[in-house]
A protein has these predicted regions:
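Catalytic cores of TIM-barrel enzymes
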Residues: 1-193
Length: 193
């Protein structure tokens, strides 16, 4: 049983030769520790040493002709409360007029190549879709929460644009990737203090 078959069996509720294993998505500070332990800076070799069954292959596919980011939050700092482009927005028209990402700028060539050469591992993929994080970055966390009450229509409009882009991006990606992927990797949480 190879890595891919193992996780497919586990997810289907069928017997497998052992428990599945995924190292996860280590923090950048962890990789030097692992590299030192295993004596290599080749992350794939490290994953093989762990006998890791899965490779999370994310589409890094947005190529704006002017090299703009997929979502241009225009944040004023790194902290969660740092205001973004909509920190002071009170108009749905302003939200709609924003330069939202265009799915026509997606190019899945490199992602498809990575999926094709991933080997016998289980391959979850797709756009991760951290909607709440992205929307919070557009406002700043505190502004986001306040505007949910004071300007709910503005928050809904930003959320709609973010979600609609991800839906279309994933629709296009799944149409191209087909059975090269085993599962959709969806990650999102809305944790507060």
């Amino acid at each position: 049983m190879n890595h891919r078959q193992r996780l497919q069996a586990i997810i289907a509720g069928e017997p497998a030769d052992r428990c599945g294993f995924w190292l996860g998505n280590p923090h950048a500070d962890t990789w030097p520790i692992l590299e030192g332990h295993f004596g290599t800076d080749d992350h794939e070799q490290i994953l093989q040493q762990f006998d890791d069954d899965m490779r999370w292959i994310r589409p890094g596919a947005y190529h704006h002709p002017e090299a703009r980011p997929m979502f241009d939050f225009q944040r004023k700092g790194r902290e969660l409360a740092a205001g973004g482009v909509f920190a002071d927005c009170d108009s749905v028209d302003e939200v709609d007029a924003f330069d939202w990402p265009n799915p026509d700028y997606l190019d899945f060539t490199d992602t498809i190549s990575s999926l094709q050469t991933a080997g016998d591992v289980y391959r979850p993929s797709g756009f991760w879709c951290p909607f709440f994080h992205y929307v919070a970055d557009f406002f700043g966390m505190e502004n986001y929460f306040v505007k949910m009450y004071t300007h709910a229509d503005v928050v809904h409009a930003v959320t709609r644009h973010v979600v609609d882009f991800h839906l279309e991006a994933n629709r296009r990606f799944f149409a191209v990737a087909g059975d090269l992927i085993d599962a959709y990797f969806f990650g999102n949480d809305f944790g507060t203090q």
